[in-house]
């Protein structure tokens, strides 16, 4: 699909979400996982773009297909064993991006069969706390938001959630 999108080696990529900042960090994370360094997120997504009065185009965009060489970034992914180890190590932090209710097991899960609650030892930082008016909070506020949740941004962090979308928001904020 990247070839048809004309995304290739050396491309600079800007991703955005139609409703603000929600799934764009997951796309950003996917590109970073496969070695793309020049990938960015349009903060606030399409709504912010429109509010700023920027041009909008309609219709299909035709581009020349390009070659992409994936370079897997193992450090961007934690498997089950990695997470178990992280939970057992005192210097590691596993941070769950789901709502407080889902984390505590008092709120419903959106997907059938997904158990409530959280991994023992995990910390909770609902992803919405990192947003303000549909955009990521200012850089100087990011560390404060993490700190208020009992998370030390100076120590290693593994982010998690129910599907990988909201965990990517936390990861993006940590990289911002």
Predicted stretch roles:
Residues 13, 155-158:
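Alpha/beta-hydrolase fold nucleophile elbow
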Residues 43, 115, 119, 160-162:
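Short glycine/serine/threonine-biased micro-segments
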């Amino acid at each position: 699909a990247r070839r048809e999108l004309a995304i290739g080696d050396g491309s600079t990529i800007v991703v955005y979400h139609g409703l603000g900042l929600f799934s764009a960090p997951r796309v950003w994370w996917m590109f970073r996982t496969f070695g793309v360094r020049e990938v960015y997120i349009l903060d606030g997504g399409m709504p912010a773009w429109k509010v700023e009065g920027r041009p909008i185009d309609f219709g299909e965009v035709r581009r020349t297909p390009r070659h992409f060489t994936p370079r897997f970034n193992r450090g961007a992914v934690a498997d089950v064993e990695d997470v178990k180890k992280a939970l057992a190590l005192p210097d590691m932090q596993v941070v769950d991006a789901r709502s407080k209710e889902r984390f505590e097991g008092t709120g419903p899960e959106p997907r059938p069969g997904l158990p409530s609650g959280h991994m023992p030892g995990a910390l909770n930082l609902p992803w919405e706390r990192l947003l303000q008016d549909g955009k990521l909070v200012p850089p100087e506020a990011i560390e404060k938001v993490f700190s208020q949740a009992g998370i030390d941004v100076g120590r290693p962090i593994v982010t998690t959630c129910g599907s990988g979308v909201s965990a990517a928001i936390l990861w993006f904020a940590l990289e911002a």
